[in-house]
From Swiss-Prot:
<keyword id="KW-0067">ATP-binding</keyword>
<comment type="subunit">
    <text>The complex is composed of two ATP-binding proteins (PhnC), two transmembrane proteins (PhnE) and a solute-binding protein (PhnD).</text>
</comment>
<dbReference type="InterPro" id="IPR050086">
    <property type="entry name" value="MetN_ABC_transporter-like"/>
</dbReference>
<keyword id="KW-0547">Nucleotide-binding</keyword>
<keyword id="KW-1003">Cell membrane</keyword>
<keyword id="KW-0997">Cell inner membrane</keyword>
<dbReference type="Pfam" id="PF00005">
    <property type="entry name" value="ABC_tran"/>
</dbReference>
<dbReference type="InterPro" id="IPR003439">
    <property type="entry name" value="ABC_transporter-like_ATP-bd"/>
</dbReference>
<keyword id="KW-1278">Translocase</keyword>
<keyword id="KW-0813">Transport</keyword>
<feature type="binding site">
    <location>
        <begin position="38"/>
        <end position="45"/>
    </location>
    <ligand>
        <name>ATP</name>
    </ligand>
</feature>
<comment type="function">
    <text>Part of the ABC transporter complex PhnCDE involved in phosphonates import. Responsible for energy coupling to the transport system.</text>
</comment>
<dbReference type="GO" id="GO:0005524">
    <property type="term" value="F:ATP binding"/>
</dbReference>
<comment type="similarity">
    <text>Belongs to the ABC transporter superfamily. Phosphonates importer (TC 3.A.1.9.1) family.</text>
</comment>
<protein>
    <recommendedName>
        <fullName>Phosphonates import ATP-binding protein PhnC</fullName>
        <ecNumber>7.3.2.2</ecNumber>
    </recommendedName>
</protein>
<dbReference type="InterPro" id="IPR003593">
    <property type="entry name" value="AAA+_ATPase"/>
</dbReference>
<dbReference type="GO" id="GO:0015416">
    <property type="term" value="F:ABC-type phosphonate transporter activity"/>
</dbReference>
């Protein structure tokens, strides 16, 4: 079986005496939802950025393949890495939206890799492409804000716009780097529910980095726990207990156990598209 994500023997050193990632091996199946769990500095974000091909591993140390195509090998990016990246949606902690541009423009950026170069440079989108953007925004519940500046949205709404961008991109893999770290509990539930919904309905592989154990257990059937750049647990989230976490993390376990979401996740509304008028060049 071709895995959605294959990471083999990945090592990354930022200093001679410290490995941010230490011989990490990870396989994620298509349609699987996995939580990367760990305290601050455990290597979660570094691992996701390597999978996306934003950074390279140490020379001669590791290989990453996404959807059967190489992202990097032995510290060098693959020649066609841009093409591979077009199938990887990345949701950043700080949203990565351009505040002065409309929400719609920020979302449609997700399809730039599929457009002719001249239209990509000029940001010219056809009516059917804008329709796809509206549909994606409707799926995340913020289509009413499509033509407002992104800076007018709340943090939770901006994160949902970032998720809509991955839908327009038709990403086969979604990597979410601490997507709820700066959000209130209600917005956090909405964002995690959206990621879980996309995972179920589209069978997209989702890997989300978290530092809250209860969130990982609620939304992700599988947890990969990192500590000091090493994988210290890879298995069912339901098997994690406070005592096990204290054994794995020592005093760092309190950071993972402290933050919680207070109530059950709410259903995410999906507004209908009927009656919408679209203007496009």
């Amino acid at each position: 079986m071709t895995h959605a994500i294959e990471v083999c023997g990945l090592t990354k050193s930022f200093r001679a005496d410290r490995k941010a990632l230490d011989d990490v091996t990870l396989h994620v199946a298509p349609g699987e939802m996995v939580a990367l769990l760990g305290a601050s500095g455990s290597g979660k974000s570094t691992l996701l950025r390597h999978i996306a091909g934003f950074v390279t591993s140490d020379a001669g140390a590791g290989e990453i393949v996404v959807n059967g195509r190489a992202v990097q090998r032995h510290g060098r990016l693959a020649r066609n890495v841009r093409s591979v990246r077009s199938e990887i949606g990345f949701v950043f902690q700080q949203f990565n939206l351009v505040g002065r541009l409309p929400v719609m423009t920020n979302v449609l950026v997700g399809m730039l890799s599929r457009l002719p170069k001249w239209r990509s440079l000029l940001r010219l989108f056809k009516a059917n492409e804008i329709q796809a953007g509206l549909h994606a925004l409707a799926q995340v519940g913020i289509d009413d804000y499509a033509f407002q500046r992104a800076s007018t949205l709340s943090g939770g709404q901006q994160q949902r716009a970032a998720i809509a961008r991955t839908l327009v991109q038709n990403a086969r893999v979604i990597l979410a780097d601490e997507p709820i770290a700066s959000l209130d509990p209600e917005s956090s539930r909405r964002v995690m529910s959206l990621l879980a919904q996309i995972n179920r309905t589209r069978q997209v592989a989702v890997v989300v980095s978290l530092h809250q154990v209860d969130v990982a257990m609620r939304y992700c059937p599988r947890v990969v726990a990192l500590r000091h750049g090493k994988v210290v647990y890879d298995g069912p989230s339901a098997a994690l207990t406070p005592d096990m976490l204290r054994d794995l993390y020592g005093t760092e376990a309190e950071e993972l156990l402290h933050d919680t979401l207070d109530s059950e996740p709410d259903a995410v509304p999906v507004p209908a598209l009927a009656g919408m008028n679209i203007a496009a060049a």
